[in-house]
Amino acid sequence: MKQGIHPDYREVVFQDSSTGFQFLSGSTATSDETVEWEDGNTYPLIRVEITSDSHPFYTGKQKFTQADGAVDRFNKKYGLSND
């Protein structure tokens, strides 16, 4: 592996902007902001819009309205029933 061409891989804290949920993970992302983690160490803070704490797939608040409409149109077009 060539030296000096790869970004630094280190532990960073990701924070969900909508819920405030934070988790520690490894990343090459950089940030000027830092935060003190539960272990007492200071890590770079990366703010993200969506995490597993706020994404509808993980929270169970999914909406399938668009997909359901497509299925209904298909069934109607080909004379199929939804049973």
From Swiss-Prot:
Keywords: Ribonucleoprotein, Ribosomal protein
Cystine residue pairs: none
One GO CC term on file: ribosome
Gene Ontology annotations of biological process type: translation
Superkingdom, taxonomy of origin: Bacteria
Keyword Ribonucleoprotein: yes
Sample GO molecular function, one term: structural constituent of ribosome
Name listed for the protein in its UniProt record: Large ribosomal subunit protein bL31B
Species, as recorded: Levilactobacillus brevis (strain ATCC 367 / BCRC 12310 / CIP 105137 / JCM 1170 / LMG 11437 / NCIMB 947 / NCTC 947)
